[in-house]
């Protein structure tokens, strides 16, 4: 079989930078699936992407499908011939349809009878005749929320398409993609290199684009160049570049020929909180801020241009002129905002509606304040130092910065600017930090607050939203989650679990519901919110790699203290790895089935004198000896050690089921054995329902 390398390039107008990688990944995955479905083997597949192109490179692709033999079964021999041995019309029709005579058919004998068969040789189709249709299907499946039309045709794509190139080795593959006929024309950089050139071979794509077109089509290479050059540029001025992955990917998606340059701004702007300046540089301008070794912002930034200029200073000056007004705005907003305290802005929160049925932002801040104070008191009652006064104060001021000029202009600085203004107002440091950390965790992988006051406020902020929105009947449906309730729920669980806070969801939900008063119309609010949080437990632990049966085993016990829930999950995960776990899980399932069939109340206590079999005596004695050791472990939540002790029962349990008839004819013996099994199961149920383990 012969193999060649395939190139497919779609030349477009500028693609959305935040979608570029997703589009390329999806294009590759879809096309690879097409190759597999078509029985076309290949060695490797990769994608290339730049602002004006999506490309695939398939190496070691078979130039044709392999020939294969397909068995085509005909009618049964019993119905293929009449009594005189002549072919029936059914047999003749089948043979004719397969291009043979009945006499040329072979026989297949199975346990169900004898059949006519034809071993048909199917010649493999040439790859070059399949590529265009497969590529079009792959493109049709791309995740494009808002496709657009261009020109006079009805073709739709994320951006207008100007060129299509499909090469199998040096062979040009004919056909159309997205209404554009395939040819060898590749467009280069808009301002450097050749505007367009002809590509002679699939293998020369990257090198020809680089040398003739001044385009680096390799996305990962552009990322690596930008990162390395930005780090070197920052080091040259004694700093460290702030290169976050999402911004790096966006910048790499904006340029075809990355050139890294360093610029500066006036030091006076450093009097403005660094977060506001960084937000302006990164969010608006796509610049990389530079910090010194101690983490202090420097009056410099690094940016990436898409052209190799003979006069880079002109480009630097241009970017400095662009960013200066934005920094000046931030300075003006900061100086203006400082004239009014956060507390003085509380009355203005009355003018902003949080949600029509849930009241204004001022009402929301007051609820958060009371709930945060309640949570802090709960933590204090459990010997965790937490100032309920600070928590209540931070909750009250938590939304005040939304009324500042800075946050109105730079929305992502909410919370952070509240912290800075709180410090300027003379609020305690705990209050200031809690105002900033109320929104944490903001995204998957983000850190959670650790200070007790911050935890109280962050929990209150999320619980108020969660309970309120559920209370007015607007729970998330399907993928829609306009109030980000799933993120809020995961945040609540993470804060409690990662800080091992002794808080009960039932108490927190009840308090939050009470604070909403008559605003809520859903009569099942508390139950619905608790169920929602329990469901988040499952998805969160699955994302962490915990087996589903482990999660279900714990969920069956409905523990409502997240820290306790986590301890149980970890204990059951550990137990699942023990040699005895499989047998004990099966035994628990058997016990559960037996007890489920018992009518009436189960007997509570085991009567030693009614234990007649050696195996049941051994199990009862071992269980009795373990219970004094288990009780303190259950009380302190040391579930892992408890299950480790219970694993010692394996042999006794196995022997019991081997030797003892539970449902004995003697009612007293039967009830005593049921009591023993019930006692056994209750010990495991102190942790989880391990009968659910697979």
UniProtKB/Swiss-Prot annotation:
GO molecular function, one term: glycine-tRNA ligase activity
Compartment annotation: Cytoplasm
Keyword annotations from UniProtKB, A to Z: Aminoacyl-tRNA synthetase, ATP-binding, Cytoplasm, Ligase, Nucleotide-binding, Protein biosynthesis
An annotated GO cellular component: cytosol
Protein's GO biological process: arginyl-tRNA aminoacylation; glycyl-tRNA aminoacylation
Top-level taxon: Bacteria
Signal peptide bounds: none
Reactions catalysed, as given in the entry: tRNA(Gly) + glycine + ATP = glycyl-tRNA(Gly) + AMP + diphosphate
SMART domains reported in the protein's UniProt record: DALR_1
Matches recorded under InterPro entries: DALR_anticod-bd (IPR008909), Gly-tRNA-synth_bsu (IPR015944), Gly-tRNA-synth_heterodimer (IPR006194)
UniProt-listed Enzyme Commission number(s): 6.1.1.14
Enzymatic class: ligase
HAMAP family linked to this entry: Gly_tRNA_synth_beta (MF_00255)
Similarity-based family: Belongs to the class-II aminoacyl-tRNA synthetase family.
NCBIfam families: glyS
Subunit architecture: Tetramer of two alpha and two beta subunits.
Protein name: Glycine--tRNA ligase beta subunit
Organism: Shewanella denitrificans (strain OS217 / ATCC BAA-1090 / DSM 15013)
Organism placement in taxonomy: Bacteria, Pseudomonadati, Pseudomonadota, Gammaproteobacteria, Alteromonadales
